[in-house]
């Protein structure tokens, strides 16, 4: 069976067992700030397991895209060198949300693996493990399925504390947890390795292929396990591992899917040996990079984007080691589509964006390598011994993406070594930062635990009645809050919109006969709407009814900006192209911010075109309509869907703008608050455009009265400029241009005069040359010159003293500019950078540079004269 056939067989089997086939979620976790990447099949069902979300089904099956290349789960450094480590993999899974439990889960797994109708694995090749106290699972395997006792292995707490075991799973220190049962396949005696729990368990003979997790308990802070009223099941089987078993190979890289990618990589690079670790790196990383970009991740210097950039650069580096030249990595997308495109159509749909992103990153990495080489050469020139400091190696690696093995190779060629211990210290600190970044944010779900969902009735209302179902103060659930208390309050129904899709949460008040609560923000926790604020009058208690009143003016302004964001998105796609995809947004009452994929800055002319398009739709004053559709109908209608967003089976489709070919100007999935007609937006005005990351641009804009204020301020500024220039309104540009040209001409004259002055000063300074340590040396202080004038003076002196040491200090106001140069025949023993560092350190400033030329600066203080006077003696020692 091929990998694709195995994937389909798994999903089809569980469909026959009453499971709903659910599409893989994005690699960017939806609504989970604690997770860097989706790394398990259960991630998209987390709220179901926590009881925070109800779905139309209680049984599900998926083939989930997963990435493990950052934070807690990081396989990056092992990829290419082992048989089973990957940055990207597929996790086949079946899930029960309070429906079936251990008996059915284990029987399903056994039937699928061993039945002649399905995978038909030899039963004598399979072993299982259970948690050492899980007699229920043991008996199911032994008495009901018929597995011999010698094939059932009990695993205890083997990780240093109670319930810390390979066979006990926990979502965290507290919360859902339970035992698990793993299924292992025996690859045969010809491969080294022992059974689970044995000293040789890390070998490759017995390989785990399926893990059945039984969420049976809730662990409280005191460590006590309490049985869950409706236990659940979470299982996972790696597609690559089971494919290796069924295709009778011992390495995942030998399965059909990887063989196709390895052959393609070898052909692209131009080599014949397909077994090299570096080729495996290229093949593996092509999968993670292409899927991450398809799911909306862009290379950057932080968070998810930083991990993606590291993976791309690692792949390119390994390709270069094999002899690849030019941009090559993007060519791996086509063979990937050939083997995975049918299961994951987003690869083809995002082909243009994926290829453009990979090409840009390869080209940028080439420039980075060039910059890194220059930096390394500069560091080598200034070293006093033969060891490159670990901090320097880390700076090259972390800031410039310069591979450490390349640094070591270059150092070795020049007779240097790298400080590996120092580098590891820096790396340890970096790994801690990565772990901290992997936490991202506090998980709101850890504070708010509410059964059921808040009913939202705010699409057409800004007031409503609701009952208080939960109150939280200082992270603890309470029954009552009083005046001055900051709290989180959950209602059974609310007109307050909770922050989502870039739109900020509503503000306003709750009130009843006992108190008033000022709502400062509204957020979601699972299905609950959480109102954050402070009690301003009296007190409020659980079960009380309150009148909920949203600030209507803020809501209306926010709605204008949200609808304008949709029109902006559609206009950008018309003007710039269909590659434009939303990467992020902020919709507040006073501003809208829209981040989108685009390689180039948007020109002023293009921005004007966008403004005209959006305002034309506003003037048309068409109705804004919403309808609830199933996801497939919404797709057929052409609704824009955001990569990384989590959509249910039924979605809210928002349409607005003029209709062309039976399609509205803008059609998007959106759960936010919007205007009733486009004319309600009033006016749209872009205020800024710029870059926020590689391949991502940001537009900020305002609407309504805010837009009018911007236009009127621009008119006021032009009027003020005209009055200063004594110009008529139609003469503004002409007069400004004339003044710019005049200023430019005067600046050139000033520069020419400064150069003449520098030449005169240089002639006078030659008389101050002295001999120090056998070298012609000029040390002088010049008053009233800044750094630029000091450079002009230096160049004039240098033209008259070619083989000398020159140290100049320019004093202007309360600042000192420093400049030093050393003739090339002296740099072996005396470096300009050392001179400047010495002076800057003594004066409390900063500076440095190359051996032959360096600059710095410092505040002017009482030590200045003394430090300059002592410099000849310091130079005498060099």
Swiss-Prot record:
It is an enzyme of class 6 (ligase). It is found in: Cytoplasm. CDD domains: AlaRS_core (cd00673). Its main location: cytoplasm. GO terms for biological process: alanyl-tRNA aminoacylation; negative regulation of DNA-templated transcription. The keyword Nucleotide-binding applies. Signal peptide: none annotated. Binds 1 zinc ion per subunit. PROSITE patterns: AA_TRNA_LIGASE_II_ALA. GO terms for cellular component: cytosol. Zn(2+) binds at residues 562, 566, 670, 674. Its EC number is 6.1.1.7. Keywords: Aminoacyl-tRNA synthetase, ATP-binding, Cytoplasm, Ligase, Metal-binding, Nucleotide-binding, Protein biosynthesis, RNA-binding, tRNA-binding, Zinc. Pfam families: DHHA1, tRNA-synt_2c, tRNA_SAD. It catalyses: tRNA(Ala) + L-alanine + ATP = L-alanyl-tRNA(Ala) + AMP + diphosphate. One of its GO terms (molecular function) is tRNA binding. The keyword Phosphoprotein does not apply. Its cofactor is Zn(2+). NCBIfam families: alaS. Consists of three domains; the N-terminal catalytic domain, the editing domain and the C-terminal C-Ala domain. The editing domain removes incorrectly charged amino acids, while the C-Ala domain, along with tRNA(Ala), serves as a bridge to cooperatively bring together the editing and aminoacylation centers thus stimulating deacylation of misacylated tRNAs. Belongs to the class-II aminoacyl-tRNA synthetase family. HAMAP family: Ala_tRNA_synth_B (MF_00036_B). This is Alanine--tRNA ligase. The gene is alaS.
